[in-house]
Amino acid sequence: MGASGLVWTLTIVLIAGLMLVDYVLHVRKTHVPTLRQAVIQSATFVGIAILFGIAVVVFGGSELAVEYFACYLTDEALSVDNLFVFLVIISSFGVPRLAQQKVLLFGIAFALVTRTGFIFVGAALIENFNSAFYLFGLVLLVMAGNLARPTGLESRDAETLKRSVIIRLADRFLRTSQDYNGDRLFTVSNNKRMMTPLLLVMIAVGGTDILFAFDSIPALFGLTQNVYLVFAATAFSLLGLRQLYFLIDGLLDRLVYLSYGLAVILGFIGVKLMLEALHDNKIPFINGGKPVPTVEVSTTQSLTVIIIVLLITTAASFWSARGRAQNAMARARRYATAYLDLHYETESAERDKIFTALLAAERQINTLPTKYRMQPGQDDDLMTLLCRAHAARDAHM
């Protein structure tokens, strides 16, 4: 497994301790973290991940350290894409701002448990089946294709997520109330003990993360077959996810090309896995069951490609006119959906805050070059959504 039982035990204790400290100091007391707090906490967890990488250099050598940092950076990038979906889920269910930290921490804990299971299943497949790399490579190429398709990006909207099988089953079989009760999971309604919608949100977040594991775990095994490093990179990237959510909440919509960058990364790793599978080929109908000479891609080269793609993706998202247009429309869609999903009991201050953000997004759309603005016959769904939000505002006033 690449590490002794003692090292595994110490690492698990460290991760569990960090999660416990995070809960006690930052989540147990209901509050919305300030930007300064989010920056400090995010920097702390990134620093811990880097210190762990330095420890890998000292005790394992530079080659293992490169593998760890490649896995950590890849999983961190994929996690940012996860955050976008978490943001859609939280907004579509109208989760109170004060309760969002608990939802995120639950999602992280659930993800850590499920992904650990996926890691060991993946390791078992690699060890016992010669064709496992072909399977992993194919999965990554399919995932890359889905991310690269515009329809794949649009499918991650609020209504699609709320219609998911997991949510429909939970909503059918669990007795839930219509309203939130702070950050509590249970409440009393009509003298009956019921679950609050917060539980449905946690189920949605946890269920969604299971789907994300299908691309993240094969991607990490494409960079290293060291199970311990895959686990450590996954754990440390997840630990900083809650703080990262509040830090880049307002920036997520700006990363409009992130999914395309991730598609390139997943496609690259998928091809790398296919090449490695061909190099060690034992499948009878491929080259008569003999290894196929292929180009070898080192982990250092993989890390370089990952860094370059992420830098280009980020720069293009922030500087291109098309990126600014997609950002404005994504923000308008998100705030309009959030406003329409508000309960009548929602405080006026929260309602006004969301509608003000919607107006700001609409103003940004109006300042765009004409060719990037919404035109008749295009983005009709968004225009309809905005009209509904304004009608709801007028009715509430």
From Swiss-Prot:
Keywords of the record: Cell membrane, Membrane, Transmembrane, Transmembrane helix
Predominant location: membrane
Subcellular location field: Cell membrane
TM region(s), chain numbering: 1-21, 39-59, 76-96, 103-123, 124-144, 194-214, 219-239, 255-275, 301-321
User: How does the protein associate with the membrane?
Assistant: Multi-pass membrane protein
Q: Extract one GO cellular component term from the record.
A: plasma membrane
What is one Pfam family matched by this protein? TerC
Family (UniProt): Belongs to the TerC family.
Q: What is this protein called?
A: Uncharacterized membrane protein Mb2742
Q: Please tell me the species this chain comes from.
A: Mycobacterium bovis (strain ATCC BAA-935 / AF2122/97)
